[in-house]
Amino acid sequence: MIVTRFAPSPTGYLHIGGLRTALFSYLWARKNGGKFLLRIEDTDKARNSQEAAEAIVKAFNWLGLEHDGEITYQSQRDDIYAIYVKQLLDEGKAYRCYMSREELDALRETQMANKERTKYDGKYRDFDGTPPDGVDSVIRIKAPLSGEIIVRDGVKGDVVFKAEDILDDFVIARADGSPTYNFVVAIDDHLMGVTEVIRGDDHLSNTPKQIVIYEALGFDVPKFYHVPMIHNSEGKKLSKRDGATDVMAYKEMGYTPAALLNFLVRLGWSNGDQEIFSMDEMRELFDPKNINRSASIYNTEKLDWLNSHYIKNTPNQELAKMLEEYNLTIASHDKKEILLDALKERAKTLKELALLVTEVINPPASYDEKALEKSLKGEAVEVLNNFIAKLSACKELHLPSEYHHVMQEVVDEMGIGFGKIGQPLRVALLGKMSGPGLDSVMAVIGIDETILRVKSALALVK
């Protein structure tokens, strides 16, 4: 069974690159009927944030990325890691190193002066004497000093590292007994039954060390897929301005889970020319072997386009529920179908849609002064007065077409073009010269509110 995992460090909030990795891991597990596990790598006590850890879980819940089983927290597993440190010591595959910080610094300076690679020199690798006084020991693993470490990668192919170029006897447990990052990653991937690791290629340099640990402990090495980074339009690392921000900020900006996940799955993976993917299609079609080897480009316009597509195609009842995030309660509004049908074609984000809804259902808080001056003068005043007179005579109007008919009557009787009524009426109803179809606006707010808004606007220009 394929088992994947997502293993963020809660030293900051979940960002877009991490979410893409999580999505790829989730899809591959679900496609194969496997498990998708969540592990919080919170061993860095100085930098970790409980708030950030909770935000990761919150983001998963918002996006519908269900993980299997309980969340694994590395900070709760020190006793487990200690067992494997002891095993390596007992088997002679690891040893205590007593070099002081001063000795290590001096060694590094000498190597740099000689233009050599900085590394631990193995001083205590085969030490069997009396330990020096007053120096706490770290635990180092006996890494291979020659030969090749081959990372069998599903994206990049076989990546070959020469041991002498990249390895030394690296630390697996600090002087205080706490285990190091690469050590706990290897232990947990084994104990959690992880068979395939999908992660950013910034982790590729860690992989040889993890393979050394797997092999020293007799563990199976998982399959790796190292995914190229996401770059901005200039081919540089994403900044917060480009989109490298907290995932939950996308919710606040008004992006839907479906759009964000669709956007992310196409960053570095494709299925022909297809752009729109439902979650079911993603689960069916995704294969990490089709991940591009080059970096993907973050494109805000593409995200906006996808988001507008999903807004247009979301059932109105569901949209109304989404808008509750913006303190809008329209689920029970008797004209919500007309309202949302008129507006959702105009919005790129839910936040924009919420603003458009507010502008329709509430009278204008202010008016565009230039629009008032340009549109509500001369003949326009007569046109609007004729319109509200006809509207007042109507007992019931419900549909946009019925309001349109009243407008058409005024146009026909006065022998004017439709723009002569449309522009001043729009300013009167919405306070500006742009907006959705007027017949839909009036169908939503009703006869009385329409008349009230027109009279209020006319009062401003008398």
From Swiss-Prot:
Residue ranges of the TM segments: none
Subcellular location per the Swiss-Prot or TrEMBL entry: Cytoplasm
Subunit structure: Monomer.
EC code: 6.1.1.17
Enzyme's top EC category: ligase
Function: Catalyzes the attachment of glutamate to tRNA(Glu) in a two-step reaction: glutamate is first activated by ATP to form Glu-AMP and then transferred to the acceptor end of tRNA(Glu).
Residues that hold ATP according to the record: K240
InterPro entries (UniProt xref): aa-tRNA-synth_I_cd-bd (IPR045462), aa-tRNA-synth_I_codon-bd_sub2 (IPR020751), aa-tRNA-synth_I_CS (IPR001412), aa_tRNA-synth_I_cd-bd_sf (IPR008925), Glu-tRNA-ligase_bac/mito (IPR004527), Glu/Gln-tRNA-synth (IPR000924), Glu/Gln-tRNA-synth_Ib_cat-dom (IPR020058), GluQ/Sye (IPR049940)
Sorted UniProt keywords: Aminoacyl-tRNA synthetase, ATP-binding, Cytoplasm, Ligase, Nucleotide-binding, Protein biosynthesis
Entry keyword Zinc: no
Protein name (database record): Glutamate--tRNA ligase 1
HAMAP family registered for this protein in UniProt: Glu_tRNA_synth_type1
Family per similarity comment: Belongs to the class-I aminoacyl-tRNA synthetase family. Glutamate--tRNA ligase type 1 subfamily.
Taxonomic source organism: Sulfurimonas denitrificans (strain ATCC 33889 / DSM 1251) (Thiomicrospira denitrificans (strain ATCC 33889 / DSM 1251))
GO cellular component, one term: cytosol
Gene Ontology biological process terms from the UniProt entry: glutamyl-tRNA aminoacylation
Residue span of motif 'HIGH' region: 8-18
Reactions catalysed according to its record: tRNA(Glu) + L-glutamate + ATP = L-glutamyl-tRNA(Glu) + AMP + diphosphate
Alphabetized GO MF terms: ATP binding; glutamate-tRNA ligase activity; tRNA binding; zinc ion binding
Lineage of source species: Bacteria, Pseudomonadati, Campylobacterota, Epsilonproteobacteria, Campylobacterales
